[in-house]
Swiss-Prot record:
Protein source organism: Salmonella typhimurium (strain LT2 / SGSC1412 / ATCC 700720)
Cellular component, GO, one term: plasma membrane
Protein name: FAD:protein FMN transferase
InterPro entries recorded: ApbE, ApbE-like_sf
Job of this protein: Flavin transferase that catalyzes the transfer of the FMN moiety of FAD and its covalent binding to the hydroxyl group of a threonine residue in a target flavoprotein such as NqrB and NqrC, two subunits of the NQR complex.
Length: 350
């Protein structure tokens, strides 16, 4: 069995968004910018900051890593003692106390899930694990229909709710085996959280990324808007499809072309359709979303990726989203963008 995963290569200054939610690459050097980086949530984080010295940068590096470690402890499905996994391990159907951050993340995810007709489903964890993209080991054979049905029976957004009681936040499930997986929005939340840290530190010019989710404010070291390149879905890591000015927004890309494995002679995508219980097999290979927050962009790109081209376009038009799609067509690719996305577009390489 052959496994191929996303790997990030980081350079400096203007970040390159790569599919399957991996960490971005930079495209040009910028000696006036302090570039900090590290690891979190099984991926890479990167922060480019203008206007601070090396001493301040070293202090900021520590604060960033500490905050991201706390975010990972909150959201991880790989740490058995994380806040999320304690909820998952519990079979109690009573309201479960959680932090305000956890409640906000789940609320946003449930909202996007409803607007994508359940395609963005944070309860799909049993299916993700069954297909080998969670903490469990990869299967030796394609799961049987019975195994898929058994896993699907443990999923469903209707089985999870967020409760606010006099300012205290709770999650409640009505299935004891419900398993919540927030990896589809975790990177976006962490990127937004880093942006808030920059604001708290009085930093007005920054670009932050966690995996494939980014957020920015102000101008880069050259006094120009932060620009992000969307990669072509090929094996060439520096092949650029489009360039956008995210203008203080969040951006995230989801793709099916790098995070996969081969099993029984078939390519198995990490993107699981909650309706079928199986990895997606349609021709939509990359979705980029620009939204007010990186968390929203991170959630929307997953849901749209699951839906496939036609259904995703219907949702994009209905919700007025800024979206760029790349579809496989024969031996090549074709692209589509919403009118809202065009307002951010600097260059399209078609």
């Amino acid at each position: 069995m052959k496994m191929t995963f996303c790997r990030a290569v980081c350079l400096a200054a203007a970040f390159l968004l790569m599919g399957c939610d991996e960490a971005p690459e930079t495209t040009t050097a910028s000696p006036a910018a302090q570039v900090l980086e590290g690891k979190t949530m099984g991926t890479l984080w990167r922060v480019s900051v203008v206007g601070i010295d090396a001493k301040r940068a070293a202090e900021l590096q520590t604060k960033i890593q500490t905050q991201l470690d706390a975010d990972d402890w909150l959201l991880s499905t790989y740490k058995n003692d994380s806040a999320l996994m304690r909820f998952n391990h519990s079979r109690s159907l009573a309201p479960w106390p959680v932090s305000e951050a956890m409640a906000d993340i789940v609320t946003s995810a449930l909202r996007i899930g409803a607007k994508t007709d359940g395609a963005m489903d944070i309860t799909v964890g049993p299916l993700v694990n069954l297909w080998g993209f969670g903490p469990d080991r990869q299967p030796l054979h394609i799961p049987t229909p019975a195994q898929i049905d058994a896993a699907k029976a443990k999923t469903g957004l209707q089985h999870l709710q967020v409760i606010d009681r006099a300012g205290h936040q709770f999650l409640q499930k009505d299935l004891p085996d419900l398993y919540v997986d927030l990896s589809t929005v975790g990177e976006g939340y962490a990127a937004d959280h880093l942006a808030r840290l920059m604001e708290q530190e009085g930093i007005a010019r920054y670009l932050v990324s966690v995996g494939g989710a980014l957020s920015s404010r102000g101008m880069n070291a050259q006094g120009q808007p932060w620009r992000v390149a969307i990669q072509k879905p090929t094996d060439r890591e520096n092949a650029v499809q489009a360039i956008v000015d995210i203008n203080g927004h969040g951006i995230s890309t989801s793709g099916s072309y790098r995070n996969y494995y081969e099993l029984d002679g078939k390519r198995v995508s990490h993107v699981i359709d909650p309706q079928t219980g199986r990895p997606i097999e349609h021709n939509l290979v990359s979705v980029t979303v620009i939204a007010p927050t990186a968390l929203e962009a991170d959630g929307w790109d997953t849901g749209l990726m699951v839906l496939g081209t036609q259904k995703a376009q219907e949702v994009v038009r209905r919700e007025g989203l800024a979206v760029f799609m790349i579809m496989k067509e024969g031996e090549g690719f074709k692209t589509w963008m919403s009118p809202q996305f065009k307002t951010f577009l600097v260059s399209d390489k078609n």
